[in-house]
């Protein structure tokens, strides 16, 4: 819904001590606003035609307050709200009409403020603000009523479907001894994991196909075959108690499923003696010792080669240094060699 901007937001407010239509002296020093000539053709013609005689708006402030009250707008009547069977399109049409009327009042107020005296602008601005506030309050309440009507219609539709289900069950011969599913027995065929449906984890009461299912009295549990309390009544309270009991039973299954992984975690890993007992102490294969034997033999050959090569390479230098440093006697013959 389009909201038109209010006039005179930048002007200081002044007290209103006179009626809206009363004569006042012209304030020469006050601000003056020239009406914009391009705004008038932009107004809808039907709004201007419907607001040709606005004497009550200028003569009495009380008439303005009565026009802004929520009782004057065409709201949905009380008996229509109680029935809940009226379509929401009619309510939306009435809301649209009320919105157009309120917009027309706002347009008229703006035009009146442009054509009136400068001293009356503040009072007209206050009236327009009050009208806008009433408009917002009214439509906020109307949206709440519309949401309530939609919720009531959904509840009534669900109640009608439940009544139809009960009528169909009453017309039939009734379920067998084990309910509509028969006596519960564990299946011997494996169920694929992607197609498995867990009733314990079903929070919204949906079946395997994702559709809403209704709890049938006397039907066994999908997990353990528990039937719960048998009730002879078919009233709303009996159905509600059966549904709550079934939900509690499924919640107990869900809690037990959640407690199993926690118990496994609490057990913890096996201790060191247990791990030692679990180790296989058989004779290892001879192939595992071959790499170790080969490495030891290679190391031994390297040591032997080093001991053989080091003395051969160090003999000349070692003997030379040893002869140079060792003291020895030198005999010199003066008269020649001794006789032989």
Curated annotation (Swiss-Prot):
GO terms for biological process: establishment of epithelial cell apical/basal polarity. Residues 283-340 form the KASH domain. Residues 53-63 have a biased composition (Basic and acidic residues). It comes from the Eukaryota. Its main location: nucleus. PROSITE patterns: KASH. GO terms for cellular component: meiotic nuclear membrane microtubule tethering complex; nuclear outer membrane. It is found in: Nucleus outer membrane. It holds the Pfam family KASH. Residues 1-291 are cytoplasmic. It is a single-pass type IV membrane protein. The chain crosses the membrane at residues 292-312. Residues 313-340 are perinuclear space. InterPro entries: KASH, SYNE4. Residues 1-86, 254-277 are annotated as: Disordered. As a component of the LINC (LInker of Nucleoskeleton and Cytoskeleton) complex, involved in the connection between the nuclear lamina and the cytoskeleton. The nucleocytoplasmic interactions established by the LINC complex play an important role in the transmission of mechanical forces across the nuclear envelope and in nuclear movement and positioning. Behaves as a kinesin cargo, providing a functional binding site for kinesin-1 at the nuclear envelope. Belongs to the nesprin family. Core component of LINC complexes which are composed of inner nuclear membrane SUN domain-containing proteins coupled to outer nuclear membrane KASH domain-containing nesprins. SUN and KASH domain-containing proteins seem to bind each other promiscuously; however, differentially expression of LINC complex constituents can give rise to specific assemblies. Probably part of a SUN1-containing LINC complex. Interacts with kinesins KIF5B and KLC1. The KASH domain, which contains a transmembrane domain, mediates the nuclear envelope targeting and is involved in the binding to SUN1 and SUN2 through recognition of their SUN domains. This is Nesprin-4. It comes from Rattus norvegicus.
